[in-house]
Amino acid sequence: MNDANKLPSRPLLAVSLSLALAVGSAHAQAPAPGAPLTIAQIKAMLGEQGYTKVDDLKFDDGLWKAKATSGDGKRGEVRIGAQGGRIYAEGARSKLSEAEVVASLTSQGYSRVHDVKYEDGLWEAKAQTSSGQKQQVYADPTDGRVVSAQND
């Protein structure tokens, strides 16, 4: 039998299988695209971003909300997108103006956009869907996309 047809040694095979299993199990723990995040994943994400003392973690208005201390020692409210996991911190500045947010919501199919305000790191507005349903909408401060929408 030539060298190309030989099986790898048992120790090498064992190491290879162990690595394959480790990579497979790590991949299995990652959330599926579009899947809602768990409390453990939310806490881990906040910790990775330097937040400590995470309290009062709850799901409300289609968003995760918590009180936490940031890496620079400031205590405040954070909101976390339920599916994307993006963190919106109280006191963070918006890259969009109110008019740009209204334009973004309109381009996403909303009409009668009003009561627009920037609060706790997210834009909030009342709007109407194309089917006429009134909703409370939360929009991302960097691109204006809807993070959460709840029937009003």
Question: Where in this protein do the model-derived segments appear?
Answer:
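A short, surface-exposed beta-strand/turn
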Residues: G76-I87, Q135-S148
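Bacterial N-terminal signal peptides
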Residues: L12-A22
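Bacterial N-terminal signal peptides that target proteins for export
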Residues: N2-L13
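Sec/Tat signal peptide C-region and signal peptidase I cleavage site
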Residues: G24-A28
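N-terminal secretory signal peptides
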Residues: A35-R75
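Conserved histidines in hydrophobic membrane contexts and catalytic metal-binding motifs
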Residues: W64-A66, A125-K126, Q136, G144
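Short, non-transmembrane alpha-helical segments in secretory-pathway proteins
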Residues: A32-T52, R93-R112
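Surface-exposed aromatic
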Residues: G62-K65, R86-Y88, Y118-E124
